[in-house]
Amino acid sequence: MPDIKTSILIVEDEESVRTSLEEVLTFFGYRTRSAADGLAVLKVIREEVPEILLSDLNMPAMSGFELLSIIHRRFPAIYVIAMSGMFTENQIPSGVTADAFYKKGDGVRDLLKIVEARPLERRELPDTPEPIWVQRNGHDVSGGEFVTIACPECFRTFPQAINDTTSLILDTRCAFCDSRIRYGIVDPAASSFRDVFSRHPLSPTPAL
C-alpha cells in the first residue's frame, strides 16, 4: 500500500462514481478528497495541493478539458490522470494535458497501476500568488472606476470596482472560482511602468 500521506483529488460530476472511486482509493491507503466540477476543484486545491488529480473529462460548469489545461499551467507539479467513458487511451482528443489516462469501467487494478506510476519527485509551489497588472477601464454607470481582471486560475474575466486608491498591490476574489487574486493598476497615461511606483515613494522601484 502507498504512504498514507499520498493525496488524490477526484473530480467527477456523477456522485455514485465519485463516491465509489473515493472508497476504493481510500481502502488502498490513499488520502482522498473530491469535487463535482472544475470550479469546485480550484477552491479545494487552495486548501491543499494534491499529489494526484483524477479528473473526468465531461463535466458541467467547467469541462475536464478546460480544467486540465488550467492545472497544467498553474500547478505543474500535480500528476494528472484524465478519465472518461467516451474515449480509449488511443482516442483521446489532442490537446488534453494529462500525464495518464484511465478508461471508466476498467478494473481497479488498472487504476492502481496508473496511480502507482506517478513519479515520486515533487516541486514545491509558492503559497502567495504573484500579482497581475491591469489598466483602468473607465467608469461604470454609477460613475465609479473599475478594471477588468482575468483570473490566472480559471482564466475567466470580470469587472472589479476600484475602492482603494492608495495601495500599490490590491486583493480581490475571482467572481467565478473565488480564488485570491493580487493585482496592481497601471495608469495608461503613465509614461512608463516606473511611473506607477513614483506615486508610492515608500515602494521599491523595480529594475527595468
Per-region residue spans from a language model:
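Alpha4 helix (beta4-alpha4-beta5 surface) of REC/receiver domains from two-component response regulators
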Residues: 66, 85-114, 123-126
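Active-site residues of response regulator receiver
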Residues: 56
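Hydrophobic/aromatic residues positioned on beta-strands within the core alpha/beta folds
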Residues: 81-83
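Receiver (REC) domain active-site loop signature in two-component systems and cognate sites
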Residues: 59
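Two-component/phosphorelay signaling modules centered on CheY-like receiver
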Residues: 14-33
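Short amphipathic alpha-helix used as the core "switch/output" element in two-component signaling
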Residues: 65-76
